[in-house]
Amino acid sequence: MTIAEEFATRNFSIYGQWTGVVCILLCFALGIANLFHVSLLIIFSALCLVSSFLIIFIEIPLLLRICPTSSTFDTFMRRFTTNYMRAAIYMGMAIVQWLSIIIDASSLIAAAVLLTIAAGFYALAGLKGQGFVGSKTLGGQGVAQMIL
């Protein structure tokens, strides 16, 4: 199934997963860019950077198979297999970035907006009763099992 065919299914979990991939790039870039502030904004930029690495393992299940991680980390990551749990973690990460406005308005707002959109897609998928469907392009639905 191509990416276009995946989007044509109108499953909001696919939209959420691909928005999550964009969040990986944006959180990584903005986390690094805002590390050079000489204020408490450094804390929020470090949390944004950590969020990008969490999202990598949440959205690309293939990495849990090929990267050496602890069983505790694997168990933690496997909690986020449902739409509601993914919506919850994305909303949690978004709230942290929205709180960065307290310190100073910065480009971290873009990360907060995109994380909120991803949480919204996953929440809509859950509310519509759509099961979580992982993108084949990102290692879902059988690709990760082919490595073993």
Curated annotation (Swiss-Prot):
Golgi membrane protein involved in vesicular trafficking. This is Golgi apparatus membrane protein tvp18. SMART domains: Cg6151-P. It holds the Pfam family Cg6151-P. Keywords: Glycoprotein, Golgi apparatus, Membrane, Transmembrane, Transmembrane helix. Glycans are attached at residue 11. It is found in: Golgi apparatus membrane. Disulfide bonds: none annotated. GO terms for cellular component: Golgi membrane. InterPro entries: TVP18/Ca-channel_flower (IPR019365). GO terms for biological process: vesicle-mediated transport.
